[in-house]
Amino acid sequence: STKKAVPEAKAALNQMKLEIANELGLSNYESVDKGNLTARQNGYVGGYMTKKLVEMAERQMSGK
């Protein structure tokens, strides 16, 4: 499902996606037609974003 569990987090998640794309060398990711990117490029952004979100949750759960 594409429905967000916390709709209020949408802006923060979009900002995180743009920051990660920049880190991965995909400048102007916001204005690029994602259909023109390879599945690998789009997958890197989503995969790295998921990794960062899991790390954040683990830190929060451990109290660090």
From Swiss-Prot:
Function: SASP are bound to spore DNA. They are double-stranded DNA-binding proteins that cause DNA to change to an a-like conformation. They protect the DNA backbone from chemical and enzymatic cleavage and are thus involved in dormant spore's high resistance to UV light.
Coiled coil: none
Site (Cleavage): 19-20
GO MF annotation: an example: double-stranded DNA binding
Keyword Repressor: no
Protein name: Small, acid-soluble spore protein beta
Further details from the record: SASP are degraded in the first minutes of spore germination and provide amino acids for both new protein synthesis and metabolism.
Keyword terms, alphabetized: DNA-binding, Sporulation
Organism: Paraclostridium bifermentans (Clostridium bifermentans)
Xref: InterPro entries: SASP_alpha/beta-type, SASP_alpha/beta-type_CS, SASP_DNA-binding, SASP_sf_alpha/beta
Family: Belongs to the alpha/beta-type SASP family.
Biological processes per GO annotation: DNA topological change; sporulation resulting in formation of a cellular spore
